[in-house]
Design a protein with these regions (language model features):
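A short beta-loop-alpha structural element at the N-terminal edge
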Residues: 29-45, 51-55
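Conserved beta-strand in the GNAT
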Residues: 87, 93-102, 112
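Conserved acetyl-CoA-binding loop-helix of GNAT-fold acetyltransferases
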Residues: 118, 124-137
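Conserved acetyl-CoA binding element of GNAT-fold acetyltransferases
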Residues: 109-120
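Conserved beta-strand-loop-alpha-helix junction that forms the acyl-donor binding cleft
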Residues: 144-159, 163, 173-176
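Active-site rim helix/loop that mediates acceptor-substrate recognition in acyltransferases
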Residues: 60-85
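Aromatic (phenylalanine/tyrosine) cluster motif
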Residues: 10, 18-19
């Protein structure tokens, strides 16, 4: 079995360009690593992401009508070499984002696929699954995937992705947040 879903076509100006397999064979999907000049764009898209989880996270908006974003945390996506904020474009249109962080859990050497957000218009077409699979299967890094047990949509999505990966997937019991489901995707079997 091999990683499927997206095929790297070329790299141009820091942009990884992927093309999806069916069900949308004519669709161009681009995952582009952003720079600090794109912080406001990511911040704006993050508002939609925060809105979608506000019911089960029980988050309220601030006095300015926006969800809280920790500025120092957001800035790390352009300061820390293991962190990145990536913009998702579909046929040239902004369709979401992918946030990657270096895990800060003690004793765990892994990158974390921290947040994947796709606008509703582009969902249920296999794009999110293809992106997640491609990222988790790329290179030799170990990957951490975490999601809240209460988030039924994320739970269904990640179970589909993780159940079909050609790499070993290990369930982790971590003490930092008991509501989080934790999975480690490794390049090879753990000893």
């Amino acid at each position: 079995m091999q990683c499927i879903g997206l095929h790297t076509a070329f790299v141009n100006n820091g942009a990884l360009r992927f093309f999806t397999e069916s069900p949308m064979p004519e669709t161009t999907v681009e995952l582009i690593q952003t720079g600090p000049e794109d912080a406001e764009l990511i911040r704006n898209l993050y508002q939609y992401y925060a809105y979608e989880s506000s019911d089960w996270e029980q988050e309220d908006v601030e006095a300015d009508g926006r969800f809280y974003i920790h500025d120092e945390h957001l800035a790390r996506y352009w300061q820390d070499p293991q962190w990145s904020a990536n913009l998702l474009l579909i046929d040239g249109y902004i369709a979401g984002f992918l946030l990657i962080e270096g895990s800060e859990l003690p004793g765990l050497d892994a990158l974390e696929l921290a947040d994947l957000f796709i606008l509703k218009r582009y969902r249920r077409k296999g794009i999110g699954r293809a992106i997640a699979s491609q990222v988790l299967c790329s290179g030799t890094a170990n990957w951490l995937v975490r999601f809240y047990d209460q988030d039924e949509v994320a739970q269904a999505f990640w179970r589909t992705v993780l159940d079909n990966l050609p790499r070993p997937v290990h369930t982790l019991e971590l003490d930092d947040d008991p509501q989080l489901m934790n999975y480690l995707i490794t390049h090879a079997a753990l000893h």
